[in-house]
Amino acid sequence: MIMRKLEIFLADLFYINRLTKYRLCVPLNIGYVGAYTRKLFDNEVNIHLFKDVNVLLGKAKSVKPDVVGFSFYYWNTNLNCFVVRQIRALYKDDVRIVFGGPSIDSINEEHRKLLVRFPEVDLFVEGEGEIGFSSFIERVLSTPDKVFEDPIDSSFFHEDGEIVKGSETGFTLPLTDVPSPYLNGYLDEFLARSYMPLLQATRMCPYTCNFCVSGKDKGVVRAFPMDTVKEEIDYIARWNKDNPHIIFNLAELNFGINKQDPEIAEYLRKTSETVGYPKSVYFYSDKRFTKRARDVIDALGDINRY
């Protein structure tokens, strides 16, 4: 008997209008989650990535999703909830709804508030989405009738009036285990639409600022392999060599804090000189503005004078 593949929708929804359509970034976040999930369950899943509400809903009418995962931020809450209502109207409870992202708080009392506020959501994923979401997909594939019988790692849900919470894995996923969504072509459709590229070389922030959502994160600062980072820069540059006006964004919490950062900056500058892209790099510098952070700016040279 041939089993049907699990249809998974991953959504990083954004308000798209005439003011924002030229400021859209590729959905790197769900790209990583999708790439990691594909790596583990390649022959058992079909994964679709979405940034546009209308594109997602159009696809949902022709392909019934089994799981829809949303990148949840407070600013896109209404968009997410609108799509959840539309999905429920189409397929009732025959679709699993998952919320994950930086606005999912790690405090237990906040968990209760989220469960009360969003009763249509089946599961909330904490921390790094790859671990919690893939653990959930493994449960759906292995025991589809008993998905919520036991806790799920890095996640919490509501069952019989109680909060059921899995083990906290924190920000500890070895980044060598995470495939590149760029190099696997998963983000090509967004690059083709001139979405701004977003590149991540490291994860975690060592600072505990009260005003920042990352201040409560627990884990280890880790770096992606330098070879992968350089290959991604090359890949993105080839896509955008004829579009030098598109801003290159670094998804670094503190660019200039890690010892590899000056090398990345130097590689960006050389790529700009040889390929013609990028001509504008946007990033957040190390908050302490150390010598290494200054070295990063020196290494970039005149790249931002385009």
Where are these regions (language model features)?
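N-terminal [4Fe-4S]-dependent radical SAM core
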Residues: 3-4, 152, 157-198
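Conserved SAM/AdoMet-binding glycine-rich loop
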Residues: 4-11, 67, 94, 98, ...
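Glycine- and acidic-residue-enriched helix-capping/strand-helix junction motifs
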Residues: 17-30
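Flexible loop/turn segments at secondary-structure boundaries
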Residues: 17-19, 173, 207-208, 218-220, ...
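Generic structural signal for well-ordered alpha-helices
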Residues: 34, 60, 81-85, 137, ...
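Glycine-rich beta-alpha loop elements in corrinoid/cobalamin-binding modules
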Residues: 36-168
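Residue-level signal for the nucleotide or nucleotide-sugar donor/cofactor binding architecture
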Residues: 128, 224, 259
